[in-house]
């Protein structure tokens, strides 16, 4: 008899179950309050019951937890300064989609050396999320792998489905059962209809195969997620202008979806030039100041230090500097947050 399975699997290593990790690192009362309130507030902003703007801001990816906590402490201070205008959520990304190959993130390879200590990565990721939430600062992340949410989702206030996975059925099913609001990005080439389709799918109940926190295969029955929205991240060209907002709103309206839009200032909208986020921010603040209410959120790729660096020389990494996409620095981040807060105040005065 011929062997017909696992022909291209060279090894297998079991990982800790989600239930074991959650037992070892339980969510605190403080963190649960942070997550609960942030999800409620985001939902209200999305549905325009709250006049503020949601801002998901932080490093492209997390590779150094000390720098991440340093950043979180700074961001918490800013969130208190602008609590009447902005709902600030820290971008805490542990998984990186790759166009071909490359470092897949802290969970997959926490030591940055291709050792793939995923147990360690899951533990580090969960501990960091606990620490950030205990500060009273909510965390947002991209759900790339459909199993890892079992390990961290109770500590996530907002989630994203990326441009490469918005069309994926399993990610739409995941979103439909998610306890937190979910943003779907437009496609890598800029198409918004796929995101509208994803929102429409996630609104509905689904039955799908997944893995329980104990590590057993099971059929999950989701009830649908009413707190889903589109994220404009650009594509073959930027899509944050007023004309793009109008076009996106028309697509949402024609699909009987709420005209609530988040703009990603990075990626295709910055033409992958991190300083261009400041140009995008200026345009968005002008729109908001003029009374644009359909923009309910923004995303910013930001770090302590500007730009990015290679992770090949681990002994000489610059503290607080990205090893994936280039980010704006902390001073520019504060400028953006101030501009956004002033724009929200101006919009409120018009209303």
Positions of PLM-derived features:
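Conserved, mostly hydrophobic/aromatic
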Residues: 58, 263, 329
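Internal helix-turn-beta structural module
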Residues: 303-346
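Conserved phosphate/anionic-ligand binding catalytic regions in large, soluble enzymes, centered on
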Residues: 54-67, 325
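Active-site-facing alpha/beta catalytic cores
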Residues: 2-5, 72, 85-240, 244-245, ...
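Glycine-rich phosphate/diphosphate-binding loops that line cofactor/substrate pockets in enzymes
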Residues: 43-51, 253-257, 351
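Gly-rich Lys/Arg/Thr-decorated short loops/hinges at beta-loop-alpha junctions or inter-strand turns
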Residues: 17-26, 222-234, 317
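N- or domain-start disorder-to-order transition segments that initiate the globular core
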Residues: 7-46
